[in-house]
């Protein structure tokens, strides 16, 4: 009785709903699990326990869509035939140990990247391309034409609804594309418009500051209270450092442990500068 009670507390703490969800899933989903993550905080293991995802052996290939950094193009509606023949699979591993993964011994015929999307999981909320396994599988299903099943999968997580609140506009754009090239073009346009909007907001903010007059004569704010709430008031688009994203061209679905999260936070630099660098990096990468 003791361990069972402990698991319930751990699941509640990590944002997982109870075990009263359906134990099977209507579409075939799989993962290669490398055991890097905390089992109680791992979305892939959670889905495996619920019977939604099956675990693949190292050396076993997958005939459906494989979300992997070995992919050359993003997943698109054109991959629906592959999905219908085999489903979707992901790699369950830690960002911090990505170099340990034997990618030559896993994968399949339809290896794909993920286009620009923003994580909503508790570990990497608001970080582009930092999707975990559940989010990556949901994104794949949504893009190839199974939005209802994507939502059904994310219903297994207390925070799952936020993935669509954050990404629904982009997911709808991608789902209406014809193929990978179309998705790359839409992704590039979206990022360019996002950067332009960001720069416009920055310029307006600067104009407001100068129109306010001499700020030395204005009353000062209580900086201690502002600082204490800085984590809560961060923008959902708060970015990790460019160095922490240098190894992932688009996305690999993973679940991070506390050590990885600490490293990412330690590498954070000026938010404005990181925003510009990362958006430009992604825009330029679609030209190559």
Curated annotation (Swiss-Prot):
GO terms for molecular function: 18S rRNA aminocarboxypropyltransferase activity; metal ion binding; S-adenosyl-L-methionine binding. It catalyses: an N(1)-methylpseudouridine in rRNA + S-adenosyl-L-methionine = N(1)-methyl-N(3)-[(3S)-3-amino-3-carboxypropyl]pseudouridine in rRNA + S-methyl-5'-thioadenosine + H(+); N(1)-methylpseudouridine(1191) in yeast 18S rRNA + S-adenosyl-L-methionine = N(1)-methyl-N(3)-[(3S)-3-amino-3-carboxypropyl]pseudouridine(1191) in yeast 18S rRNA + S-methyl-5'-thioadenosine + H(+). Coiled coil: none annotated. It comes from Schizosaccharomyces pombe (strain 972 / ATCC 24843) (Fission yeast). InterPro entries: RNaseL-inhib-like_metal-bd_dom, Tsr3-like, Tsr3_C. Keywords: Cytoplasm, Nucleus, Ribosome biogenesis, rRNA processing, S-adenosyl-L-methionine, Transferase. Belongs to the TDD superfamily. TSR3 family. Residues 229-253 have a biased composition (Basic and acidic residues). The keyword Nucleus applies. One of its GO terms (cellular component) is cytoplasm. Residues 209-267 are annotated as: Disordered. PANTHER family: 18S RRNA AMINOCARBOXYPROPYLTRANSFERASE, RIBOSOME BIOGENESIS PROTEIN TSR3 HOMOLOG. One of its GO terms (biological process) is maturation of SSU-rRNA. Aminocarboxypropyltransferase that catalyzes the aminocarboxypropyl transfer on pseudouridine at position 1191 (Psi1191) in 18S rRNA. It constitutes the last step in biosynthesis of the hypermodified N1-methyl-N3-(3-amino-3-carboxypropyl) pseudouridine (m1acp3-Psi) conserved in eukaryotic 18S rRNA. Required for processing 35S pre-rRNA at site D. It is found in: Cytoplasm; Nucleus. Pfam families: Fer4_RLI, Ribo_biogen_C. This is 18S rRNA aminocarboxypropyltransferase. S-adenosyl-L-methionine binds at residues 43, 91, 114, 129. Residues 209-221 have a biased composition (Polar residues).
